[in-house]
Amino acid sequence: MIKGKSRTEVKALAQYICMSAHKARRVIDQIRGRSYEQTLMILELMPYRASYHIFKLVYSAAANASHNKGLNEADSFISKAEVNGGVIVKKCKPRARGRSYPIKRPTCHITIVLNKRSNLTKK
């Protein structure tokens, strides 16, 4: 049986963030399953560069929830948070004696899904 999306599920997606997926996952693992307010407090205090991008994405997902679905941000929690690897931007850096060194800039795609706390089904 295929389940349909719940009406209270809100998604935000950030693509081509110039950072490796491994570094972004280290921050995402800390906020998965937490409430909206608790997530914002954690992300403000984390010293990692990825926390700024994830903070903006969580804030955007909450704005989507309140504007599009009319949900309250205080009742929402992060039901799904994932980081996938994106394309690798390849460049060449010129070096001495006509040589060149490759530069690889990894990118990642971050997905945040907010859900309403009262819709959490207990099994």
Swiss-Prot record:
Q: Where in the cell is it found?
A: Plastid, Chloroplast
Q: Which UniProt keywords apply?
A: Chloroplast, Plastid, Ribonucleoprotein, Ribosomal protein, RNA-binding, rRNA-binding
Question: Where is it chiefly localized?
Answer: plastid
Classification via SUPFAM superfamilies: Ribosomal protein L22
The record's listing under InterPro entries reads: Ribosomal_uL22, Ribosomal_uL22_bac/chlpt-type, Ribosomal_uL22_bac/org-type, Ribosomal_uL22_CS, Ribosomal_uL22_sf
Instruction: Show the GO MF annotations.
Output: rRNA binding; structural constituent of ribosome
Q: Which CDD domains match?
A: Ribosomal_L22 (cd00336)
Q: Would you say which domain of life the source belongs to?
A: Eukaryota
Mention any one GO cellular component term assigned to this protein in its UniProt record. large ribosomal subunit
Which Pfam families does the annotation name? Ribosomal_L22 (PF00237)
Tell me the Gene Ontology biological-process terms attached to this UniProt entry: translation
UniProt-listed PANTHER family: CHLOROPLAST 50S RIBOSOMAL PROTEIN L22-RELATED, LARGE RIBOSOMAL SUBUNIT PROTEIN UL22M
What family is this? Belongs to the universal ribosomal protein uL22 family.
> What's the subunit arrangement here?
Part of the 50S ribosomal subunit.
Q: What does this protein do?
A: This protein binds specifically to 23S rRNA.
What HAMAP family does this protein's entry cite? Ribosomal_uL22_B
Q: What is the protein named? A: Large ribosomal subunit protein uL22c
